[in-house]
Each structure stands twice: as C-alpha cells, then as structure tokens.
Amino acid sequence: ASFNEAPPGNPKAGEKIFKTKCAQCHTVEKGAGHKEGPNLNGLFGRQSGTTAGYSYSAANKNMAVNWGENTLYDYLLNPKKYIPGTKMVFPGLKKPQERADLIAYLKEATA
C-alpha cells in the first residue's frame, strides 16, 4: 500500500514514536549535529546519503532516494529491504498509522 492510501497522520503521535524509536540515533533540529544516524533537518526533498558531515553507507549514497512522503512511507516499513546495505539497524514500522504519524511529525519537525 502506498502513502496515498495511508490513514491521516497525527504529528503528536508521531513525535512520541520519534522519541521512543528514532531519537536515540537522530536529531531533527537545525544545526543539532549527528548522532549514530544523521541529523534529519531538511529531510523532505533531499537525496539519501547527502547530509554534510555524516559518513553514510555506500548503499545510502548509491540508492539516491529523493525523500518525501511516498519514499519515507515505503522505507519506514522495512529499511533494510528498501536500501539493502544501509547502516540503519531500525527494523521498521509495520503499522500504516504509525508510519503516517511519524511522517506527519517529521514534516513539521525537520522543516
């Protein structure tokens, strides 16, 4: 199923998901720097593997994904299947609602 078929996302619920499942490795604030994973500020419309100052896997660079609602929705289901060889150890979010909520939060938090 695609993002177009996903339920409407709730940014507040998405923030909780981010804090429990993503924040140990990622930051969203402008200038917040990298952790285990890259800072996600300016994520939407950016190509995978291009954040300055972060050491990406060759897989993330070579995949050249343009991040947006549709690509994030597919990626967040199963990151290792979407980008084989990614360093991201996160297993993914199986529930469409959780993915929609996280994307709604990221749209606001990374803008």
From Swiss-Prot:
It is found in: Mitochondrion intermembrane space. One of its GO terms (cellular component) is mitochondrial intermembrane space. Gene3D superfamilies: Cytochrome c-like domain. InterPro entries: Cyt_c-like_dom, Cyt_c-like_dom_sf, Cyt_c_1A/1B. One of its GO terms (molecular function) is heme binding. Heme c binds at residues 22, 25-26, 88. Coiled coil: none annotated. Its main location: mitochondrion. GO terms for biological process: mitochondrial electron transport, cytochrome c to oxygen; mitochondrial electron transport, ubiquinol to cytochrome c. Keywords: Acetylation, Electron transport, Heme, Iron, Metal-binding, Methylation, Mitochondrion, Respiratory chain, Transport. The modification N6,N6,N6-trimethyllysine is found at residues 80, 94. The modification N-acetylalanine is found at residue 1. Binds 1 heme c group covalently per subunit. Transmembrane segments: none annotated. Electron carrier protein. The oxidized form of the cytochrome c heme group can accept an electron from the heme group of the cytochrome c1 subunit of cytochrome reductase. Cytochrome c then transfers this electron to the cytochrome oxidase complex, the final protein carrier in the mitochondrial electron-transport chain. Belongs to the cytochrome c family. This is Cytochrome c. The lineage of its organism: Eukaryota, Viridiplantae, Streptophyta, Embryophyta, Tracheophyta.
